[in-house]
């Protein structure tokens, strides 16, 4: 590698300079404090784990996104986490299983992806999230959405939030009712995610399903909009199995609760919203800035994962990329905060004064010998005492 190339970072890997890092740290502190005010306890999972543990109960996409390496101590395969959610589920199921009937945990940390998850996205995002364990009802889903919206407002990155909400049980139940093979289910899933109407029609024609199954699966791509979508769904999916009707009832309950608790929230019901289809088990949701196609936070219910760690329990939650949120904020110019400079000196009285100033939250830096004074204020000895004065106005004594 040449000198010219030695400073290059891998594609999709970024770093934060002081101003960006300061802004991100402020976000970090304010959001963790906010989650604690909701009763969520912070946990810090490790950056790497044994691969089989890291991928337990997760979708194939997470396996693809995970960097893998060999542990030089045990010879076993390790994975660098690409998502902290399974790690927190492991902690909840194994280490904290007897702590509370309903457990609320939050987390923040760097993750690493083998490939970017979207155009222009970072491969080393900082993931922040929160999970509720031990409650299967719509109330915990609503709490997750409500807190997600609260955190987004706290960041100042958005003034208005558009929420897409769906339920993976609808498509799953219809696919089972239609008797789709796993290959057919995957192909139709892909087309539904892209809202590719012509492809959906061609696939359904090729599957040769009975009329009811064909029409209900065809209707999914069109069933999105405000709460009136649920009324349309009750008609168009009238022949659906009970599991689908239960999923629709859950969506109705959740959307009603959200309308009461967050009347300013713009809610879009999308019955073909299948984000995390192979991982989630119920409601799925994503938050957007109105007019943007890029989700700024997302989550859903995943009731099965705890079983893989020996303690089955319902769970729901959400996560976001703190780096991406920071890009939505205006650049904050460095405040011209008072910085106090002092010449290098080992006077005990000076050292005590510097310590007291720092305890009071002041910024004090030592001027290295030969370096120019660049601070707004200077600590000088006047009448036998160390005093803070504006640079250029001091007199020694």
Locations of regions flagged by a protein language model:
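TRNA-binding/sensing appendages of the translation machinery
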Residues: 1-86, 142, 164
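Positively charged, Gly/Ser-enriched RNA/tRNA-binding surfaces
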Residues: 20, 26-37, 50, 85-96, ...
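A structural signal for short, well-ordered beta-strand segments and their strand-loop junctions
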Residues: 42-45, 107, 162-166, 268-270
